[in-house]
Amino acid sequence: MLVFPALKKGEICLEYLIEYGMFLAKAGTIVVAVIIVLSVIAVTGQKNKKPGKKGSIKATRLNDHIEEMRDTLREKVLDKDYLKLVYKKERKESKAERKEKKQQLKKGQAEEVDSEETRKKRFYVLNFKGNIGAEAISSLREEITAVLSIADPRDEVLVRLESPGGMVNAYGLASSQLLRIKNEKIPLTICVDKVAASGGYMMACLADKLVAAPFALIGSIGVIVQLPNFSKVLKKYDVDYEMISAGEFKRTLTTFGEITQKGRDKVQEDVETIHGIFKAWVKDHRPSVEIDKIATGEVWVGTQAKERYMVDEIRTSDECINDACDNAEVYEVEYVFKKSIQDRLGRVLESTADKLFSKWFERSTDDKYQ
């Protein structure tokens, strides 16, 4: 165990410094040894690894989660005698519901008439948290494929969307994934609790019902191209920059090359073209908006967006899901990618470093204010 002696102001404890140095050396040796061993295991594992599934679908019944929280709170809050009556009533209702369902199946029809025909509506919840490259597409496409393999127009899909936008092609693909749901005539609700801007709104406007929280950021229907240019810096220091290309507009804006007015005009033309396509996309899917008034690149909060017909309702995703649990079977669907040993090792090391830094920072702060 490392003992930290109490030092008087200005006192230098050589013994403490030596002990602390030895501690760091031992700790560093152990960490390096562990990393080497795990790296060898990882490399060996990768060599012997057989191709298989990239990941798997996980489905969580949200009704159970809400019922569990409700029951826990009931037991703490309600009188015991009253609670017994509540449970008795619920058991009776559940029994009556099962009996009615059984009778409906008997009335009828052949054994092939499965409970599917008399089942409750199913409500599938997906999550999309986008970055500049919309990397969450990798999971979204798998989740949608899984849902479409079982859902039908009686069901509904709710997507909790959070994205400030990003690259046009990436968000175009993400939007196309949502179109798969609409093409199957399955109702699509999109909930925005925080932000759906630019490419995020490109996705959101596809919803049959678009719901936003009061202060969610909505809009930014615009296109931007920006990059720094160091051509003047290179000239100042007599550094040549060579670029060979074929095609008049193969390179219009570059980081190190000199930008010509012709190149600048071409980029502006491309930006205007993409903006026009973006506007047409929004107008096609939300015909009630005044597209020229909202496609200015501006952002509005949820309540302002509703006034401009950019969203349909002001609510949170929690409200939508809780309401759905009253009348439907609600499932949160998530595609989980398998993590390699390298990924797991990286996360462990990152977590360890964060904890060590946090502890050091806390101790430093405590010492400062003692």
Feature names for model-found ranges:
Residues M203-K209:
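Alpha-helix C-terminal capping segments
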Residues G200:
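DNA breakage-rejoining catalytic core of tyrosine-based enzymes
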Residues F4-T189, V195-A196, K209-A213, I224-Q370:
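N-terminal organellar transit peptides
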